[in-house]
């Protein structure tokens, strides 16, 4: 049984996911955590009653070994580590929705303080790719930025949605770190510097990421799922009714391999095998876990796993010895395991009893009479599954239809479908009433996104009189673009927006790609190039035209820029295309973007004006306060009252101005997100180097406020003529 080697109770509440540990003087490890009052506390039990100079840091009135760092804003992310290798000690990085602070705790001074327009939702510190100096990488409003120790912006790119989690991991085994990004659009993206090298789609918002070892990493979702990936392959995952607040990799059983440590919202901490997800250790706190870190907190040469709760309770655990391996859990946990095994035993005994009763019934009854009740079906019974596109009717919207049928007169009593990202809870049960039983069932499926999905099916097959059923299991993949129906050619419906590119592939290979990614009717015959196919979206009725010429030139007509990007990325993956330059034009979308850019300029102007007004008000407040105090000292009560009335009015104006600034900032963030997403979409229309060039050139055009150049880059992929 593994017990904590130390326990602390700090009188400060800790914000979830905002705990870090660092050697801020180069020697002593100290905990840093954000509070809910716009402060960061630093717990240093090694040098008590240390003198603190007057700056951001002041001594906590509650505890002598806790110093408080005033941020005066809600802290949104926090980490610690070596930012400047020449200093020889760690820096503290604190992010808010408007700024990033790099703080030198030892000298009580700012390393840099940068305004970040896209906010900082997540932060990670380390080296990325071939960039030699350590970077503080922040993820915000669809954007990623990396700053060195001087505050210089050395890395910038965009991603598909608001960033929630970041981690650095050697994903491809080349000895250099790649950036893992988890975002609100359920995707985990892997950046090799500014190039996306892999994408994994999950079922919910990705809230946490952590490197395990090599190319293996852990992840957590907002629906209570935690798991482990090795590159793009998921090893395992489990789902809990509680939320995973923090995950961390730590070798708790001393077997040389890191386990996945998870802190939960109900106060539980558990350690799971990286290979199987089996729980090897767990403990409970009285409140939710805020963060999990590691460090030699006792300065005895041994690294401890340090778990912190939101109420300020801190426990440190030493890894188990070789003798304790496999016995890290307490007796209550072992009793839980015994109960679980007993339940499995009961289930097996019940199954055995069913077999025995079947055998007795077979001896006591004529064969045919007993068959139906026992669920015996013909040996040649087969389960058939087909996928097709249904345009819907008055009572049902358009959908993809899954038809499940048997090969004889047996009936399907129930169907269980397990699929990620389609059904609530990832499962769906179809259980027809006793009067509607038949040998086939049609199930409507409406995937919300264009991603391939594996449907895992379990069908209960028997006869109407059966009390026991045979279970058929099957797996069927839903194609990526299953929500698009093949339609007849209609030049009048051709969208004006298009992308155009050339690939060195035979037309027949493109036909194979179409067959794998769309649900084409069985009687569909596509002639050799040149040819054209037309589809209609089942979601919004939008049109999609794909034209292929003999030369390998492909034109895709659609008004949906996201769909065009998905098709290009799908083709690039199928045909193993490394670099692809594309010409694109989306007039309606570009006009909407132009309006957004005008709004961004307007909101920036309003922000500057409001800031100037606030500065003027601040100067006026000083003069009014001095005047009011002078009048009080001179016992001129009438003038004093007049000055304080003016102060009251000025204070009201300041509050109103603050509300306007908040609304203006919210609107500005929304429009900046739209701009960043537009750059990301323009990048997704290309592959490889052209993609990176478009993203970089778009950012340069926005920096120089050259809107016409921006749209030219989005259309042709370059600013040069």
From Swiss-Prot:
Pfam families: BBS2_CtH, BBS2_GAE, BBS2_hp, BBS2_Mid, BBS2_N, BBS2_pf. Widely expressed. Its main location: membrane. Residues 325-369 form a coiled coil. GO terms for biological process: adult behavior; artery smooth muscle contraction; brain morphogenesis; cartilage development; cerebral cortex development; cilium assembly; fat cell differentiation; gene expression. One of its GO terms (molecular function) is RNA polymerase II-specific DNA-binding transcription factor binding. Changing residue 349 to W: In BBS2; has a modifier effect on BBS. Part of BBSome complex, that contains BBS1, BBS2, BBS4, BBS5, BBS7, BBS8/TTC8, BBS9 and BBIP10. Interacts (via C-terminus) with BBS7. Interacts (via coiled coil domain) with MKKS. Interacts with CCDC28B and ALDOB. Interacts with DLEC1. It is linked to Bardet-Biedl syndrome 2: A syndrome characterized by usually severe pigmentary retinopathy, early-onset obesity, polydactyly, hypogenitalism, renal malformation and intellectual disability. Secondary features include diabetes mellitus, hypertension and congenital heart disease. Bardet-Biedl syndrome inheritance is autosomal recessive, but three mutated alleles (two at one locus, and a third at a second locus) may be required for clinical manifestation of some forms of the disease. This is BBSome complex member BBS2. It comes from Homo sapiens. The lineage of its organism: Eukaryota, Metazoa, Chordata, Craniata, Vertebrata. The gene is BBS2.
């Amino acid at each position: 049984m593994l017990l904590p080697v130390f326990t602390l109770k700090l009188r400060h509440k800790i914000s979830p996911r905002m705990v870090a540990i660092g050697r801020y003087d180069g020697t002593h490890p100290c905990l840093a955590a954000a509070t809910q009052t716009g402060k960061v506390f630093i717990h240093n039990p090694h040098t008590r009653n240390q003198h603190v100079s007057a700056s951001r840091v002041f001594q906590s009135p509650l505890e002598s070994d806790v110093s408080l760092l005033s941020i005066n804003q809600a802290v949104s992310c926090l980490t610690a580590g070596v930012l400047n290798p020449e200093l020889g000690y760690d820096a503290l990085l604190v992010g808010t929705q408007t700024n990033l602070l790099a703080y030198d705790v030892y000298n009580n001074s700012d390393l840099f303080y940068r305004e970040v327009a896209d906010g900082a939702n997540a932060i990670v510190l380390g080296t990325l790719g071939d960039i030699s100096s350590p970077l503080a990488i922040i993820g915000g409003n669809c954007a990623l930025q990396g700053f060195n120790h001087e505050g210089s912006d050395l890395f910038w790119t965009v991603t598909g949605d608001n960033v929630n989690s970041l981690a650095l991991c050697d994903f491809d085994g080349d000895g250099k770190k790649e950036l893992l990004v988890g975002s609100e659009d359920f995707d985990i993206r892997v950046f090799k510097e500014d190039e996306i090298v892999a994408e994994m789609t999950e079922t919910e918002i990705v809230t946490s990421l952590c490197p395990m070892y090599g190319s293996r990493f852990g992840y957590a979702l907002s629906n209570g799922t935690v798991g482990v990936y090795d590159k793009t392959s998921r090893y395992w995952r489990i789902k809990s009714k509680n939320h995973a607040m923090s995950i961390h990799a730590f070798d708790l059983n001393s077997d040389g391999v890191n386990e996945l440590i998870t802190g939960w919202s109900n106060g539980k901490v558990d350690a799971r095998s990286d290979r199987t997800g089996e729980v090897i250790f767990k403990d409970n706190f009285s409140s939710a876990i805020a963060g999990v870190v590691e460090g030699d907190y006792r300065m005895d040469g041994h690294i401890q796993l340090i778990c912190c709760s939101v109420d300020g309770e801190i426990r440190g655990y030493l890894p188990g010895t070789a003798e304790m391996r496999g016995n890290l859990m307490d007796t209550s946990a072992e009793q839980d395991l015994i109960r679980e095994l007993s339940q499995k035993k009961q289930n097996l005994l019940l199954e055995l009893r069913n077999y025995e009763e079947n055998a007795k019934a077979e001896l006591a009854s004529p064969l045919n009479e007993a068959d139906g009740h026992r669920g015996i079906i013909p040996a040649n019974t087969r389960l058939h599954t087909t996928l097709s596109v249904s345009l819907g009717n008055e009572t049902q919207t358009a959908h993809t239809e899954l038809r499940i049928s048997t090969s004889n007169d047996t009936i399907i009593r129930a169907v269980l479908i397990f699929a990620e990202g389609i059904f609530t809870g990832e499962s769906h049960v179809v259980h027809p009433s006793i009067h509607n039983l038949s040998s086939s069932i049609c199930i409507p499926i409406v995937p919300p996104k264009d991603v391939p999905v594996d449907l895992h099916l379990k069908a209960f097959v028997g006869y109407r009189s059966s009390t026991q059923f045979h279970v058929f299991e099957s797996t069927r993949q839903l194609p990526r673009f299953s929500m698009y129906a093949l339609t007849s050619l209609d030049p009048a419906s051709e969208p004006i927006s298009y992308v155009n590119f050339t690939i060195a592939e035979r037309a027949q290979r493109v036909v194979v790609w179409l067959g794998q990614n769309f649900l084409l009717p069985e009687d569909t015959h596509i002639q050799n190039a040149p040819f054209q196919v037309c589809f209609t979206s089942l979601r919004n009725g939008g049109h999609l035209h794909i034209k292929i010429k003999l030369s390998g030139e492909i034109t895709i007509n659609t008004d949906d820029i996201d769909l065009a990007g998905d098709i290009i990325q799908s083709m690039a993956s199928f045909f193993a295309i490394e670099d692809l330059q594309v010409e694109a034009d989306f007039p309606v979308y570009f006009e909407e973007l132009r309006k957004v850019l005008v709004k961004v300029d307007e909101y920036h102007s309003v922000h500057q004006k409001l800031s100037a007004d606030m500065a003027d008000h601040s100067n006026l407040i000083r003069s009014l306060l001095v005047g009011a105090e002078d009048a009080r000292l001179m016992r001129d009560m009438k003038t004093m009252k007049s000055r304080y009335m003016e102060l009251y009015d000025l204070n009201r104006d300041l509050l109103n101005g603050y509300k306007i600034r908040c609304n203006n900032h919210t609107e500005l963030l929304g429009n900046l997100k739209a701009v960043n997403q537009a750059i990301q979409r323009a990048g997704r229309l290309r592959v490889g180097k052209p993609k990176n060039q478009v993203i970089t050139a778009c950012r340069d055009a926005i920096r120089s406020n050259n809107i016409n150049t921006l749209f030219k880059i989005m259309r042709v992929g370059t600013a040069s003529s």
